[in-house]
C-alpha cells in the first residue's frame, strides 16, 4: 500500500465535507473522470460515476486496482424495519427509508466518511479513521432517536464497527461494474451486527485498542459485552465484543463526541 495515496485519499473525503451537496457531486465527477480498472484500462466516466464513493474514486484515478489499505467500516441497519414497512403504504415506507438513508449519509460525510452501499434498509459506510466512524455512529444514534415515525414509534438502528485491512477492487462485467470492499474486517463487522440490540453500537477489541491510541476518552466509553462471541466463519477465534451506551446522561461519551 502506498502511504501517500492513502493520505491523499483520506484528505479527499474530508475535503468534500466543506462543499455543498451540489458542488460535492460535481467535484466527485471531476475527481473520478478517469476510471482505472485492475487491468490498467482507462474508460471515460459518465456522471453516474459521481456515485462512486470518495476514497474509492481516488484509488480509481491514481492507481490500478485491486489495492489493500486500512479503513474503518460502519454497518448501519434499521431495526424492526419489516414491521414499519408492512404496517404502512409502500410510498410512506419509502419516505421513511429515504429519510433514514439521508440522515445516515449526511452524518457520515460530516465525519469524513462516505457510503459504499445502501443495502436494503441499511448502509455500509467507511472512514479513514475509526475515531471518525465511532463519532458518526453516536451522532446517527442521537439523530434517529429525535424523530418518531408516523405511528408514533421511535426509529432505531443497529450499528457495528471495525477497523483493519480492506481490499478494494472492481467487480462485475464490462456492461455493469461496481466496486467491492473485501476482507475479514468487513465480514466481522457484518456478523457483529446480529449481536447488538436496537440503538446499540458494537465493536470488536481491535476497535477499542485503536481508539486507545487515537481517541482515549472515546475508548473508555466502551463496555465489554459479556463473554466473547463465537460466530460462523470466525470459530477459530473468540471475539471480544464491546458496546457503546447511548450518550444521554453520560458525560464521558458526550465529551468524547466533542473532542
Predicted regions and their residues:
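Intrinsically disordered, glycine/charged-rich C-terminal tails and inter-domain linkers
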Residues: 1-57, 198-259
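Structured catalytic cores of enzymes that bind and process phosphorylated ligands/cofactors
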Residues: 58-59, 65, 79, 84, ...
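Catalytic NTP-binding/metal-coordinating core of nucleotidyl cyclase/transferase enzymes
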Residues: 59-132
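A residue-level structural signature of the nucleotidyltransferase/glycosyltransferase Rossmann-like core
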Residues: 73, 158-159, 200, 239
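A conserved hydrophobic position in a structured secondary element of the catalytic/binding core
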Residues: 76, 128, 163, 202-203
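Alpha-helix/helix-capping structural signal
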Residues: 79, 165-166, 187, 206
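Alpha-helical scaffold within the catalytic cores of cyclic-nucleotide enzymes
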Residues: 97-112, 124-159, 163-165, 184-186, ...
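Catalytic-core segments of nucleotide cyclases and related cyclic-nucleotide turnover enzymes
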Residues: 168-194
Amino acid at each position: 500500500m502506498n502511504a501517500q495515496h492513502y493520505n491523499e485519499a483520506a484528505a479527499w473525503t474530508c475535503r468534500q465535507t466543506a462543499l455543498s451537496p451540489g458542488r460535492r457531486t460535481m467535484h466527485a465527477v471531476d475527481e473520478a473522470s478517469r476510471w482505472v480498472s485492475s487491468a490498467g484500462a482507462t474508460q471515460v466516466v459518465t456522471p453516474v460515476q459521481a456515485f462512486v464513493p470518495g476514497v474509492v474514486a481516488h484509488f480509481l484515478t491514481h492507481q490500478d486496482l485491486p489495492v489493500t489499505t486500512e479503513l474503518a467500516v460502519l454497518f448501519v441497519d434499521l431495526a424492526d424495519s419489516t414491521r414499519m414497512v408492512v404496517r404502512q403504504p409502500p410510498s410512506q415506507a419509502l419516505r421513511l427509508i429515504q429519510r433514514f438513508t439521508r440522515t445516515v449519509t449526511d452524518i457520515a460525510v460530516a465525519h469524513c466518511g462516505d457510503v459504499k452501499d445502501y443495502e436494503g434498509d441499511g448502509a455500509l459506510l467507511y472512514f479513514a479513521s475509526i475515531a471518525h466512524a465511532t463519532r458518526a455512529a453516536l451522532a446517527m444514534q442521537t439523530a434517529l432517536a429525535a424523530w418518531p415515525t408516523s405511528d408514533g414509534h421511535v426509529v432505531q438502528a443497529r450499528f457495528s464497527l471495525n477497523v483493519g485491512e480492506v481490499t478494494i477492487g472492481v467487480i462485475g462485467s464490462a456492461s455493469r461494474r461496481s466496486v467491492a470492499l473485501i476482507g475479514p474486517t468487513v465480514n466481522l463487522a457484518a456478523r457483529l451486527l446480529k449481536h447488538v440490540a436496537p440503538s446499540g453500537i458494537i465493536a470488536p477489541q481491535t476497535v477499542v485498542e485503536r481508539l486507545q491510541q487515537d481517541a482515549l476518552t472515546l475508548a473508555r466509553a466502551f463496555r465489554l459485552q459479556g463473554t466473547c462471541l463465537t460466530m460462523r466463519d470466525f470459530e477459530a477465534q473468540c471475539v471480544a465484543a464491546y458496546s457503546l451506551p447511548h450518550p444521554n446522561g453520560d458525560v464521558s461519551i458526550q465529551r468524547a463526541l466533542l473532542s
